Amino acid sequence: ETYDAYEKRGISREIFRDTFYDLTFWCENCFLEYGEYGIDEYDWFFRHMKLTIFRLGRMQFEIMDSRWNFTAGERMVKKGDPIISIHIPQGEKLTLESVRESIIQGMAFWGKEMPYLCHSWLLYPGLKDILPEKSNIIMFQNQFQIVETDWDEREAEWRIWGKVQRNLNVYSENTSLQRAAKKYMAQDSKGKII
């Protein structure tokens, strides 16, 4: 059914495949967190079925109503205004070239009339304190104007370690990002990275 809807709208088989490959990541995440394969992000996949989110290159682009009031440049966006939300799926390096190519593809697909917004832990300003200036994450951040920081989220911990823990000491230190994030959380940042 969903594939038929893609065909009716003239959306390529490649975009369908890339968009639905997302299921693989969420199944893997479920295994990491619970020890069995499955999907516990049901509401996320309605977006795929309703054809509101598409993977175009490295990133996903979703048409949605803004959940926030914000000003970007000279443009005011009110809660409920249509926007294109940019999501960063796991699984591949986030190179500057892949980000730029993906944004070009997103704008070719959705147009340039609506504002584009990214609500991600990768944009947390404190990452500039722990990562090298030339890291892919910092180069990604530099593509955006940071409008606001969401202090209530703990997605970074989940993304960096696969699970949010109450005790900071149980977090592994297998990668440079894990080591830097754990040290940062221990020193400051209210014990978390957004």
Task: Report the location of each language-model feature.
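Non-catalytic substrate-recognition and accessory regions of acyl/acetyltransferase enzymes
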Residues: 1-94, 111-115, 126-194
